[in-house]
């Protein structure tokens, strides 16, 4: 069993990261379980889902047969991409024994910012920023409490070149104030 945290550490040591952003469920979470669950974190809109980055899988089906789908490289164009079906299958199609995943170089810079504002303003800002050339990587809205349900917190992660992240962070500060 290969743990998700071990994979993240191994990739970080090489200046790389997964091409998608899976949630972290603790030290016992496995890479096969991560793919089988098919869950995506707040960067799904920009980074894509797990299934978008599965290149190939080996699995053990219910008849104890080892099956191989896909490959180890991006160029895999023959027939159905069955390996993508494994993402989110929760193990119903078989137990994943090996998986090939797309990885990317780590971004040179990232910044996570949070601001308190109304839900309407948060949606307007995200819509505006999404239509601009800003390095918006992830966002999360956390609803206010029962006393102020229309107020909440908008978390935004900028990721990319150092200058782009700095400019986007400053842009966010200005836009939130207006």
Region annotations inferred by a language model:
Residues 2-178:
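Noncatalytic alpha-helical scaffold of FAD-dependent oxidoreductases
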